[in-house]
UniProtKB/Swiss-Prot annotation:
There is a cross-link at residue 57 (Glycyl lysine isopeptide (Lys-Gly) (interchain with G-Cter in SUMO2)). It is an enzyme of class 1 (oxidoreductase). Its EC number is 1.1.1.27. The active site is at residue 193. Interconverts simultaneously and stereospecifically pyruvate and lactate with concomitant interconversion of NADH and NAD(+). The modification N6-succinyllysine is found at residues 5, 118, 318. Substrate binds at residues 106, 138, 169, 248. The lineage of its organism: Eukaryota, Metazoa, Chordata, Craniata, Vertebrata. This is L-lactate dehydrogenase A chain. The modification N-acetylalanine is found at residue 2. GO terms for cellular component: cytoplasm. Belongs to the LDH/MDH superfamily. LDH family. NAD(+) binds at residues 29-57, 99, 138. The modification N6-acetyllysine is found at residues 5, 14, 57, 81, 118, 126, 224, 232, 243, 318.
Length: 332
């Protein structure tokens, strides 16, 4: 007896089931799910896989997204504790790890998360040996280094979300002050994602007009308008949001989807993301810090050589030394 499906549909060919644009998100906490929904709403993948260790939560999140399929353009959403569900991913986004507690610095999380990465990364590599890895878990610069070491991937394929969000926060606050949309407010925050990030005051502009040229005191202590406060707010903003709602999610999710779009669509846009920076700015160790990078289908193909003031360069170097001090003690 022919089934209803057979009566309705005449099959012409057996299709091979390898996805062309698959994205995996590891970790379905607040950040992972914000990444997932942002990616789904930008139509970046033909398959989305979710992985976590908490099976009930994982299945619930998957079902909840699947029930929205009518309103999305991603035909397959899968999940599992076993990494076989991640096979053939183009991009794997790692958000899993211990969460930052109120008042806790990102660097404090480090050894807890290294141990988690020792399990995750080899499993990802096993099933998607040609993927790009996008690291979001904190402290992101150190964990990007850890993922690079464990994976054995070339450095172009291991990317940290880095200062993409810090720069977005900076441009939002700049826009609020000037009454201009953040897209038209240009400014870069580089270095460590977190407390020692470096705002590049010389690069701040609207429509190519340098703010530093108009206002030479910009970013200095003697600035009457105290633009330094804008960067201070960027540094404090995550702590404030965590204090108020317990975690951050939406902005980082949108920021990650922005990076995923450049990678999946080979856009070659420039983003401040964490990459291996050894040999630049007098840095001699294997550290990952954010500099402006061209992102496309191969991950980071190029980076932009930013001219820094001696003070900015010294701050970057100091960040690198701090990170290396922690990295060289890590057990993995």
């Amino acid at each position: 007896m022919a089934t209803l499906k057979d009566q309705l549909i005449h099959n012409l060919l057996k299709e091979e089931q390898t996805p062309q644009n698959k994205i995996t998100v590891v970790g379905v906490g607040a950040v992972g799910m914000a990444c997932a929904i942002s990616i789904l709403m930008k139509d970046l993948a033909d398959e989305l896989a979710l992985v976590d260790v908490i099976e009930d939560k994982l299945k619930g999140e998957m079902m909840d997204l699947q029930h929205g399929s009518l309103f999305l353009r991603t035909p397959k959403i899968v999940s599992g504790k076993d990494y076989s569900v991640t096979a053939n991913s183009k991009l794997v986004i790692i958000t899993a790890g211990a969460r930052q507690q109120e008042g806790e610095s990102r660097l404090n999380l480090v050894q807890r998360n290294v141990n988690i990465f020792k399990f995750i990364v080899p499993n990802v590599v096993k099933y998607s040996p040609n993927c790009k890895l996008l690291i979001v878990s904190n402290p992101v610069d150190i964990l990007t280094y850890v993922a690079w070491k464990i994976s054995g991937f070339p450095k172009n394929r291991v990317i940290g979300s880095g200062c993409n969000l810090d720069s977005a926060r900076f441009r939002y606050l700049m826009g609020e002050r000037l009454g201009v949309h953040p897209l038209s407010c240009h400014g870069w925050v580089l270095g460590e994602h977190g407390d020692s990030s470096v705002p590049v005051w010389s690069g701040m502009n609207v429509a190519g007009v340098s703010l530093k040229t108009l206002h030479p005191d910009l970013g200095t202590d003697k600035d009457k308008e105290q633009w330094k406060e804008v960067h201070k707010q960027v540094v404090e903003s995550a702590y404030e949001v965590i204090k108020l709602k317990g975690y951050t999610s939406w902005a980082i999710g949108l920021s990650v989807a922005d990076l995923a779009e450049s990678i999946m669509k080979n856009l070659r846009r420039v983003h401040p993301v964490s990459t291996m920076i050894k040999g630049l700015y007098g840095i001699k160790d294997d550290v990952f810090l954010s500099v402006p990078c061209i992102l496309g289908q191969n991950g980071i193909s190029d980076l932009v050589k930013v001219t820094l003031t001696p003070e900015e360069e010294a701050r970057l170097k100091k960040s690198a030394d701090t990170l290396w001090g922690i990295q060289k003690e890590l057990q993995f």
